Amino acid sequence: MRIRIALLLVVVSLAAATAKAIALRTSEYSSESGQSITYPDPTQRVLTHREQNALVTPWIKKRFDTLLAGLMTREGIDMWIIPSREYNEDPVFASMSPLTYFASRRRTILVFSNPGGGKPAERYSIGRFDYDGIYPMVASTNDGQHEALRKLVDEKNPKVIGINESDAWQHADGITANEKRRLVEALGPAHAAKIKSAEMLAVGWLEVKLPEELDAYRHAMKVAHLVIREAFSNKVITPGTTTNEDVVWWMRQRVVELGLGKWFQPSVTIWRQGEKANPRGVILPGDMLHTDFGIVYMGFSTDTQHNAYVLKPGETDAPAGLKAGLKAGNRLQDLTMQYARLERTGNQALADALAQAKKEGLVPSIYCHPIGYHGHAAGPPIGMTDYQQGVPVRGDYVFRPNTWHSIELNVTHIVPEWGNQPVRFALEEDAAIMPGGKWDWIDGRQDAFYLIKP
């Protein structure tokens, strides 16, 4: 009996300690507490899904309260209507819903109204779900949603109604033909005549970020870099045995084990002396390895391209020619960011950076893209792999503060140690344009090879 009582006391004590630990963790990461958030050392752990949601939900509310009305005023839209159906959501939907929701529930009609006068935008969910209290709910049955919408539009009587349809911006083209038809029918001719594309409002909403989100993104990037560092090490790679596909699938599995999301399949390619670009198969001493890798964490996507060198017996560093190629890639990064300034367009930055790079003797290709809620996110691209003369429409959009971008590019460089073989050095790092216009790497950039022992 005494043993049973003692065991019971131990169990109760452990349960209490566990509950206390969970409570402490929840408090530590709650942005609603008004306290600064300390992110965990990514070498020890990542945030649990519960901890992530405790951060993301208040950010969504703050974005609505501090950003949306100004964006609606800038784009001249009084009311923004975003219908989504389960498994056929608008691309904007995920940025407006908590991590506890993986899809729209049945049909959800989100409505945003700008009251003017510097007041926050009003927000409504027409249907049966308030999305964890983010939205005041205009309750209605499935068959009555459009009738409830019409009553709300009559009440607010907006001059301009925005919907997400666009030829140029995939992020702002979420309304289906059926949903638009039903919307127009419900609004009636007078209100339907007020409809215009909300494409630039959708782009503006998706591209601008809060300072708190940037802090979180830096943590996410550290986690992504850590996975790459681990993959490009002898923990994963045994030269002469491990294949590039082995590394690819190790990275994919590692993402799952960490509880992270993914938005594209990782890649690991090989550059080797005397062979055509990107041979596949067993990794050997003397190979240069390249990876393209990204994760989804706290609702944010990352995108990174790094390079490693497999040492030959007796080597302690990569050949000078390979290091010079990496340095040339760093120079192209500098030039790209130098010419991508606030209120300049992506096409202007592309033309100027390419011109200066060629003057300096580089063989460049630039194809940067915004990043954030999507991997290839809303905002101005700087070229594309097949658009080195400029990107139509989207490339004429300007850079704005508090936005994030993947600086993605490559240079082709001659490597003397490889018999003057031309080698492509591809790099990609995520960076933010700060409020004053200065660029800031999210978590530094690669300027030296990962070294793998033979």
Regions found by a protein language model. Give the residues of each.
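Positively charged n-region of N-terminal signal peptides that target proteins for export
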Residues: 1-4
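Bacterial N-terminal signal peptides
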Residues: 6-16
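Active-site neighborhoods and metal-handling regions in enzymes and metal-associated proteins
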Residues: 23-454
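Sec/Tat signal peptide C-region and signal peptidase I cleavage site
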Residues: 18-20
